């Protein structure tokens, strides 16, 4: 800690020289990172040169990127969003940028800094104002005077869970709502809304077919949200909902009908069971439940936004397994359950977590692919020699 203080004191003096020279505005974000932010976290014990410990500029498929991800024993512990010297850290969009990505990734903490100031947020708090999510903030002038607080972002601190303890003591973790819990709750709410709406407007349809149709429509909407955020499909769901909803009296076609027409186009594009024709496409739905569900799948403006390109596949897999559990529980109570769900139950077919997939690929496929690569390289070299 004493060695860290010396290094940070040197950075403070360097910053004040730049400040007094009036050249603060000349520093770009990258120059700020190189000259101040990276050395600051190196002083706090992080190995910036080790990509397994600190990743630089993790990209988001929905656009943009996050500056640094900090890992401990392979586990992501916080994301850091860097800004150029003299940036206005009070701007809410800066903080939300860091918080949004961390929350969707299921990471507890988000850090925002331009070196002059530093803010730490609990990204898992989604209710209340932005200040409710802030765990602490500190100005560069207090980096040494209040070093114990700055040290909460050190590698040693995370090894000992010190930031967790600090957040608990200051009641900054009590309202924590992880992405997996929130998404699962919202998906359940969407399923309930759809099922009730279909039952209301299609009284002659079989109840089990109604449930199946509701899940099929929900599957398609989630797929489209993922495709939108990954840049595979344009952002059409919200625009469709808003455009048709705002002109409801003029339009003979509502959002639900427009979507069912769109599904026929998507079936030609993706040629998969997901978009194959289903009876629900000819059902009635006139209480705007589909519009409400689309809004839910985008998140709650000002509190949290779903970014399906950042949400780990484990989260989506867990949500779907919860649905299968729901279906199987209904079967125990005498309600019919789909053959697909029964098959998964009987044969032990469940979603495989990412870390297990990575382990299997690394230990089963990698050795084989390495041999293939070596063989191909040998053949190429041998052929080149023959040609020569």
Region spans (language model):
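Preference for the N-terminal adenyl/adenosyl cofactor-binding alpha/beta module
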Residues: 1-21, 84, 154-388
């Amino acid at each position: 800690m004493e060695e860290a203080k010396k290094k940070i004191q040197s950075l403070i003096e360097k910053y004040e020289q730049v400040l007094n020279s009036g050249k603060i505005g000349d520093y770009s974000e990258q120059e700020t990172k190189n000259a101040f932010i990276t050395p600051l976290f190196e002083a706090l014990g992080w190995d910036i040169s080790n990509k397994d410990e600190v990743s630089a500029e993790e990209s988001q498929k929905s656009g943009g990127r996050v500056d640094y991800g900090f890992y401990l024993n392979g586990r992501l512990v916080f994301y850091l969003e860097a800004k150029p010297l003299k940036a206005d850290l009070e701007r809410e969009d800066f903080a939300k940028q860091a918080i949004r990505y961390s929350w969707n990734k299921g990471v507890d903490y988000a850090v925002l800094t331009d070196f002059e100031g530093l803010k730490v947020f609990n990204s898992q708090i989604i209710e209340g104002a932005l200040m409710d999510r802030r765990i602490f903030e500190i100005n560069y002038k207090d980096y040494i005077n209040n070093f114990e607080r700055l040290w909460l972002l050190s590698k040693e601190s995370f090894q000992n869970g010190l930031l967790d303890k600090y957040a608990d003591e200051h009641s900054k973790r009590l309202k924590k709502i992880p992405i997996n819990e929130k998404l699962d709750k919202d998906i359940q709410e969407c399923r309930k809304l759809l099922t009730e709406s279909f039952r209301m407007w299609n009284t002659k349809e079989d109840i089990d077919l109604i449930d199946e149709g509701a899940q099929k429509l929900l599957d398609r909407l989630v797929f489209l949200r993922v495709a939108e955020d990954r840049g595979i499909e344009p952002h059409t769901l919200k625009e469709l909902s808003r455009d048709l909803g705002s002109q409801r009296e003029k339009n003979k076609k509502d959002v639900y009908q427009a979507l069912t027409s769109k599904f026929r186009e998507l079936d030609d594009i993706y040629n998969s069971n997901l978009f194959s024709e289903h009876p629900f496409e000819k059902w009635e739905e006139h209480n705007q439940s589909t519009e409400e569900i689309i809004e839910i799948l985008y998140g709650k403006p000002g509190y949290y936004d779903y970014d399906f390109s950042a949400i780990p596949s484990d989260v989506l897999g867990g949500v779907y397994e919860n649905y299968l559990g729901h279906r199987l529980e209904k079967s125990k109570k005498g309600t019919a359950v789909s053959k697909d769900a029964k098959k998964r139950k009987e044969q032990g077919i469940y979603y495989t977590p990412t870390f297990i997939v990575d382990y299997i690929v690394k230990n089963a496929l990698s050795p084989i692919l390495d041999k293939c690569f070596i063989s191909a390289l040998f053949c190429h070299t041998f052929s080149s020699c023959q040609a020569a």
